[in-house]
Design a protein with these regions (language model features):
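Secondary-structure "cap/kink" motif recognition
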Residues: 1-178
Length: 178
């Protein structure tokens, strides 16, 4: 009976789910993001303190979209291993053609994080993730795939131009005759 208890306890500990943040490097050292989904891709690059959409000088990057990238996407936790079989990547939408790829690049031009996100078809509040060269597919603790759009208009908006108020025109009512 005691042997069965320890055997059962040992087999249960193998299936425990631990969570781990996907990105642990210094956020201040990130200078570029590359996001790709299928044939569509976008590059976001930091110039001094401002983020820019590479190849687009008419849109100003939305701070809310960048905040989501730093505060939500990079802070996603990977949990339970869903699959250890690369042949099942398509099932979890984390293969080359259906996954959303995110590369995080530092000031030296080195890739410090590479992730492939896939939507969960059964639980819309979560997503699947592959991390770097790790062949495992993990369940992420939240769904952030919608924050990884390749559309320029998701990341940027037309620059707001301040239009000065028109000078007031004095109205002289003394010239009005009844």
């Amino acid at each position: 009976f005691i042997g069965l208890y320890f055997f059962n306890k040992g087999s249960q500990s193998k299936h425990k789910s631990s969570t781990e943040a996907i990105f642990s490097n210094d956020l201040e050292d990130i200078f570029k993001f590359l996001i790709q989904n299928g044939e569509e891709a976008i590059e976001l690059a930091r110039v001094d303190t401002l983020w820019r959409i590479s190849g687009n000088d008419t849109l100003e990057v939305k701070s809310r979209s960048m905040d989501n990238l730093f505060d939500k996407v990079l802070k996603v936790n990977r949990g339970t291993i869903i699959s250890e079989n690369p042949e099942k990547y398509g099932k979890y939408s984390v293969d080359d053609s259906t996954g959303t790829h995110l590369a995080v690049i530092d000031s030296k031009g080195e890739t410090v994080g590479y992730y492939v996100f896939g939507r969960s078809k059964s639980d819309y509040s979560r997503s699947y993730i592959r991390v770097g060269n790790d062949p495992n597919v993990y369940l992420a603790d939240q769904n952030v795939t919608y924050m990884l759009s390749t559309r320029e208009t998701y990341w940027g908006e037309k620059q707001k131009v301040e239009i000065p108020p028109l000078p007031s025109i004095p109205t002289d009512t003394s010239a009005v005759t009844n």
